[in-house]
Amino acid sequence: MYKKITHDIVEEHFDHPMASQLKHQMDNKKLIPKLSSYYIGSDYSVGLNDPLPQYVLNENTMLFRMDCRTAWNKWVYSLLNYSVSLNGNLPGTDQVKGRMHKNAVAIGDMLIPYYGPTAGKLVGTSLIAIDDIGMHYVEALKNNEPTEEIVASWVPFVNDFAKILNELNPNNWPAALITDILLAVVKAWQDQLTARAVGDIIADEIAIDLIAKLVVTGIPDHGKGFDSLADVFSRGIIAQFPSMFQD
């Protein structure tokens, strides 16, 4: 015999100021154009594991990939700059914070020629939300406050970012890959910021080096190959729109 059992479940979530805006954007499917509108007919787009066509291996493509590395490098290290400015009580802390948001917007703007302004804004907004949680983490460390809730709040925003990229380019930006890299970046941020706060110079340097590998240079001699977040980002665009990268 069975009997019906009713449970009352209460969920608590970190109240990040960007949460309601991002939720609205993710729920409103009209904000993300249909994938079919991104492909340019028979443009010979390729997937993550396919070789790029020879005609895109040119100087313009190389410069684009370097520009992407520069943009992601500025973004990922802007949180560390904020930590230095805040903990040093420097007068330009507000400007550093604004620059962090500007760097996030710049990455979104790189998508506009390929996916349109709505997608670019959505990516930039998602990165700003991830930034803001990082700033809360820095402030909590400075004030000797608990960080567990802040750390946990990063996960849904990382997942949202990965989902956005995957919807734009499912063949080259698998959600699991983007999530894996970005969560590793978040962990490296925590390690670096904590090490800096307690004066552990060696751990600080190790974390900074790992951040560079995860986001900019890639991990050399990795068994399965490990491209950086910047290279996955740029290669995905080139692979989806190869005709736009011909000489």
Q: What feature does the model see in each segment?
A:
Residues 6-90, 96-100, 104, 136, ...:
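C-terminal amphipathic alpha-helix
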